[in-house]
Amino acid sequence: MSAEYFERLERGLREEMEIARRARSKGLDPETDVEIPIAVDLAERVEKLVSIPGVAERIREFEVQGLSREEAALAIGRDFAEGRLGKGASRLDAIDMAIRTSVALLTEGVVAAPIEGIARVGLGKNDDGSEYLKVYYAGPIRSAGGTAQALSVLVADYVRRSMGIAPYKPTDEEIERYVEEIGLYKRLQHLQYTPSDDEIRTIIRNCPVCIDGEPTEEEEVSGYRDLPRVETNRVRGGIALVSAEGIALKRPKIKKHVSKLGIDGWGWLDVLGGEKKDGGGSSGKFLRDLIAGRPVFSHPSRPGGFRLRYGRSRNTGLAAAGINPATMMVLNQFLAPGTQIKVEQPGKAAAVAPVSSIEGPTVRLTNGDVVRIDDPSSFPWISSPEALRRNISKIIDLGEILVSFGDFMENNRPLAPASYTFEWWAEEFRRAGGDPAGMEHVDGRTAIRLSRDFGVPLHPDHTYLWHDITLDELDLLADAASDGEIDGDALLMDMREDVKEVLEKLLVHHKVRDGMIVVEDALPLLLCLGVDETGRRWRREDLNADNALSAVNQLSGLVIRARAPTRIGCRMGRPEKSDRREMRPPPHVLFPTGSEGGKSRLVNEAAEHGFIEVVVERRRCPSCGKEGFAFRCECGAHTERVRACLSCGVRADDKCPRCGTETSAATRMRIDVKGTLARALESLGERVDNIRGVMGLTSRDSTPEPLEKGVLRAKHGVFIFKDGTSRYDLTDLPLTHFRPREIGTSVDALLDLGYTHDIHGKPLESDDQILELKVQDVVLCRNAGDWLLRVSKFIDDLLVKFYGLEPYYNAERPEDLIGRLMIGLAPHTSAGVLCRLIGFTRASAGYAHPYFHAAKRRNCDGDEDCVMLLMDALLNFSRSYLPEKRGGKMDAPLVLTTRINPAEVDKEAHNLDLSFIYPLEFYEATLRNANPKDVEGLIDLVSKRLGSEGQYCGFGFTHDTDDIAGGPRNSSYKTLETMIDKMKSQLELAKLIRAVDATDVAERVINSHFLPDLMGNLRAFSRQSVRCVKCNAKYRRPPLSESCPKCGGRLVLTVHEGSVRKYLEVSMKVAEEYGVSSYTRQRLELIQMEIESLFRSDKVKQTGLADFV
């Protein structure tokens, strides 16, 4: 990719930075300069994230020396230990900086784990009086991943040794506390891998560093409580994550680095299990925790399920899988571009992308015909759910699912046997001396002739699923064909249900007419059945075969491949996401209204009270000394925050010199909301009602936003997130190539953006040419364009009316934003990535280059991220607004990456395959379940191109698609109104799909969703609090006054009878209709009895003797 492209992006960034700096210099914001530092590479990103000078230069030196990321992380630790970095720091500070910097390097300087996941380090005393090192981990360490978590402990040990600190020597009680605590955490939260009790004991007994942590859960341990060296009885999530997902799971990686660096004291790793990998084969894990309304599409490896097809389309890879748009339609439109599916293999989940060039579903129509639907336009009724129910009686086969080799490589999953598809046949035909061009579809006679003349297997179009039937069924079908009539190339047989069922299992397309089964183009079928004009040519006892596939190979005299040896089970996960990011309730401005703002937090309502008392930041003017909360004083000077110790009252910028606690500028003061709002409206020349603020501020200093920004946001209907920015969330989908018509951008506009030639080197002239996507360009949902247009109008008003500058965007329609710069940001991270908008699609997803997603440390298995206009972030983001609580700095652009270097993105992108064709040797390797690493040399991967010009361009793909946004616009999970409607559709679909056991689905829905919900609601009703309808205050017990002590408002229950009964009736009905187990029915009956006894009067009516007469 040309340097001109990156220079163009950076030139646009410099232009917007200049405007933002001019605006910020007016002193109307917490700081007088833009608060998002720019980073050009990983080294600079790490340094700016951890704020330690000299780190970037040292990382670059390690890169020159050729050190891997892990080796560099340990070398950084040595630098801190030996004083080359962090000069003048205390022992604990040096250790703290070493661990944070190492974790930042291991996570590409993107995630918040280094600053949020490591709370602090400390020293403790062993029983022998020696000091040991404690590292306090917090919940956000999860975002670092297991390898970084484990290596952080190794770095801590490395630095500990250099500083002469003794190893940790736990007591037996402390060891058992870890065993109990990790087990309890597993019940409360998800763990990728749960070590056995003995493995936990081994880790804690031998780890030379004490893995400590902050309490993250409300639950407390019940056994090993009040231990002298353990500061809390509550569950510490950090210790469970680092011990289980870190050390236990990533043992082989730690061991490798321990051996390479010659660090002693870690030999105990050999007795751990760790790195548990699924060894292939069928697994039903994806069916766990089934949710009502989210259908199962196929049980594990079941005939009729998705057939595995290897390859990558231009909109798949990086965990996204391709499915024919017709399949999406046929499945009651539960699947749409971006919908997450939980899959059997190769990974745990995938996002769905439409690929029209793979096979669609095979269905039985209500008239008995069996057809395959590859093109939805051929069956106009397919887009209507009602018409689907009228026209389809059974979904016999779901069609193909396109999975790339790179996804098997990334998951280290043995290659599953490939389906026999055209691209495999083409490679065999090419090796035999033929030219496969134009032969993707051939008739039966041609298929037989090519097979005989060239000695290649029968063409996939006429290779049926013989492995799905038994020898008895083969015998039955041969008899029926022999008794039938051959009319030219067609076969006519008497209509018999058992014969038709065998044909359906084979996926033989046929019609039912006048009591006859009609198979057109039947010559290959007859050849495989050993039937000709004279009838059947074989007897069962003559066969030397133990299965039908082997038998048809003998009977036909041709090579017949297994058409679909691998089926992939799957169910629906999360629906696709395309929506604005909102806090709850959504505010226009981070300005406190207190209880005076009412339950809607309206600034206008608070202003009616005149003065209100709230906690805000105390600021002082350096010129005139006046104190208040405004950023600019009436005299025109920019004010300064005044921090003081909340305990001692001593004023200090960071920590109290007397007691050492962190200072804050947050002060309870009376503020004139009425006057402030009136001045804001007057200065802007606006009159806006219903400006939503917040109840209170959660940042360290309780810093409020200028009220003028809220006025303008309310005017344009724009809402704000916790850091001052306005965001739009979208499901991630990959895209390496596109057609101009797919993104709604004209050829002229694309030429202006630098898209001058297509992938074949031809000048761009038509909107149907395929172009290679530049790595920092993105294509968004059209709804996102509408939202960004509103934000752009707010920004222009802000520049003109608040900052006194010229408007920047001047946009009247979403297309006017094409070419504008934005920031992409993933949850749990702290580094935004610069990007450019080039178009819109109808799909509810965000398309971007795999590098762009990987730069945010995301893949495309259903993850969702946000985008924001660059100018919005530069003007409105401030660290001063971020919540002070743990995790407050996550999901905030603390640093901005301006140029993507493929070597510095998440390594999953390095396994993206770029070939136009998979070689024949690859398909043959799948038949022996080869390890992906054994065939890595056959496939062109990103990892092989790093450091060359080819790392940015010249990407290939094996399968094209007509439209990257094909299929339904939204999943019906989002469009169906009630949960009952969703579940009804889910169970109807289960009955319709051959690969699904509807009874099992019904049982799983009841057991994993409805029963826990019923029990939880029943428990919640008995423990509920009461709520004030006026101020929303909640009370654990109803006050004796029967009204709100705060405002006198009416109190109501927070859990109602309807909430408890919600799923009872439907659960009983489903249990009866689908014949679930008696155990499940009895559980429902017991809960029904409990609910009835709770809500029905149990008073006994007094009866007399006369009542019985």
Swiss-Prot record:
Organism, scientific name: Methanothrix thermoacetophila (strain DSM 6194 / JCM 14653 / NBRC 101360 / PT) (Methanosaeta thermophila)
Family: Belongs to the archaeal DNA polymerase II family.
InterPro entries: PolC_DP2 (IPR004475), PolC_DP2_cat_dom (IPR056172), PolC_DP2_central_dom (IPR056171), PolC_DP2_N (IPR016033), Znf-DPOE (IPR054475)
Subunit structure: Heterodimer of a large subunit and a small subunit.
The enzyme's E.C. designation: 2.7.7.7, 3.1.11.1
Pfam families: PolC_DP2_cat, PolC_DP2_central, PolC_DP2_N, zf-DPOE
One GO-annotated biological process of the protein: DNA-templated DNA replication
Function: Possesses two activities: a DNA synthesis (polymerase) and an exonucleolytic activity that degrades single-stranded DNA in the 3'- to 5'-direction. Has a template-primer preference which is characteristic of a replicative DNA polymerase.
Reaction catalysed by this enzyme: DNA(n) + a 2'-deoxyribonucleoside 5'-triphosphate = DNA(n+1) + diphosphate; Exonucleolytic cleavage in the 3'- to 5'-direction to yield nucleoside 5'-phosphates
Biased composition (Basic and acidic residues): 573-585
Name listed for the protein in its UniProt record: DNA polymerase II large subunit
Region: Disordered, residue numbers: 571-597
